[in-house]
């Protein structure tokens, strides 16, 4: 992986493939940069693709305190690497981040988002409870509990969560669980 330095000094890791107009892939929750990997070969036929690991994930650094503005600066640094403008594709909370980056005035040529989990009014109360419980779990160092909260919010049953806790993938999810707070910040109140 190659890296670019964001405005606050954080190293942001990315892989670059193909040639043509730049497309930056913005991954969602618990993604270390691998979520969009299957898109890269197709897009790279006609684009220069920047598939990156958002801060705190994969090989990218993480500088406290977290702020949504830092993630927008990360995308700005990638746009700089891409020559000054780019298309953005964001999945899930990465879609919310891509929209925030465009709204902040970054040089975004086009934007596409997939399954951004914005809430309707009926879910706002559930979201507030989730964010409060997530914040408490992470403050107490209970990454596994934070991951279970996320899975429950996404519709997993208690049995599914119990089974997931014994899977080989659980440790990887726990390693990224602190970034669930970052995704919550991207989605706002």
Each PLM stretch: what is its role?
Residues 3-61:
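Conserved HGGG/HGGXW glycine-rich cap/lid loop of the alpha/beta-hydrolase fold
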Residues 41, 50-89:
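Active-site loop/oxyanion-hole signature of alpha/beta-hydrolase fold enzymes
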Residues 85-122:
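Conserved hydrolase catalytic core segment
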Residues 117-126, 157-160:
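A short beta-to-alpha transition loop/helix N-cap that caps and shapes the active-site region
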Residues 138-139:
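Hydrophobic/aromatic side-chain positions at a characteristic register within alpha-helices
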Residues 143-149:
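Solenoid-repeat scaffolds in large eukaryotic assemblies
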Residues 154-170:
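Short, charge-rich amphipathic alpha-helical segments embedded
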Residues 168-189:
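Hydrophobic, aromatic-rich cap/lid helix
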């Amino acid at each position: 992986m190659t890296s670019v330095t964001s405005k606050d000094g954080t190293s942001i890791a990315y892989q670059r493939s193909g040639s043509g107009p730049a497309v930056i892939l913005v991954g969602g929750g618990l993604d270390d940069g691998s979520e969009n990997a299957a898109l890269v070969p197709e897009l790279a036929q006609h684009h220069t693709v920047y598939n990156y690991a958002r801060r705190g994930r994969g090989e990218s650094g993480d500088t406290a305190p977290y702020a949504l503005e830092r993630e927008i600066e990360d995308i700005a640094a990638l746009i700089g690497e891409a020559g000054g403008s780019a298309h953005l594709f964001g999945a899930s909370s990465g879609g919310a981040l891509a929209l925030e980056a465009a709204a902040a005035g970054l040089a975004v040529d086009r934007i596409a988002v997939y399954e951004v989990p914005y809430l309707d009014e009926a879910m706002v109360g559930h979201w507030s409870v989730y964010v409060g419980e997530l914040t408490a779990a992470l403050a107490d160092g209970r990454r596994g509990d934070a991951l279970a909260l996320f899975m429950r919010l996404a519709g997993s049953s208690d049995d599914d969560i119990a089974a997931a806790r014994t899977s080989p993938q659980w440790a990887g999810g726990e390693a990224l669980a602190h970034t669930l707070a970052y995704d919550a910040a991207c989605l706002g109140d």
